[in-house]
Amino acid sequence: MSESRLHHLACGTPDVERLARFYSSVLGLPEVARHFEADGSLRSIWLDLGAGIFMIEKSGLEPSLVSGVGFFLLALRVSPEERTAFEGRLGAAGAEIESRSEWTSYARDPDGNRIALSHYPKAAPAGPAAAKPG
């Protein structure tokens, strides 16, 4: 039996173009596809996450801000040098860094979704043993 891997993350927004532009221009995620409704209106833009796809989908719901840890957080793996550069790019785009840890910087995208830039040096645990507490 094969192990499951990330296929995609999906995020709803009332403004697909704006959110995709932020993730492409500020965080460097390349666009890989656009999908349209039968009437020709934009339904989604897909961005490359490297190990999967980030699907930015049209939603009729207005974004709701989650304070602290919430339902949505997109954390990107970066080098320490990239973290510093991305912090500058986020600030220039109006997405101020809300908090920092030794390894990770946290900000919000234009819809208020939490994003993180992390260079945690340890590999993520793998396999069934990783799920066991203690």
Where do the language-model regions lie?
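N-terminal beta-strand motif that seeds the catalytic metal site of vicinal oxygen chelate
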Residues: 1-18, 71-74, 78, 123-134
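A short beta-turn/loop motif at secondary-structure boundaries
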Residues: 37-40, 64, 109
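Conserved beta-strand in the GNAT
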Residues: 55-57, 115-116
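Residue-level structural signal for beta-strand termini and adjacent loop
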Residues: 37, 59-60, 118-121
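Vicinal oxygen chelate
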Residues: 14-17, 69, 73-114, 121-122
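Short, charged/polar surface micro-motifs in flexible loops or helix N-caps
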Residues: 50-54, 61, 80-84
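Core segments of cupin and vicinal oxygen chelate
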Residues: 11-53
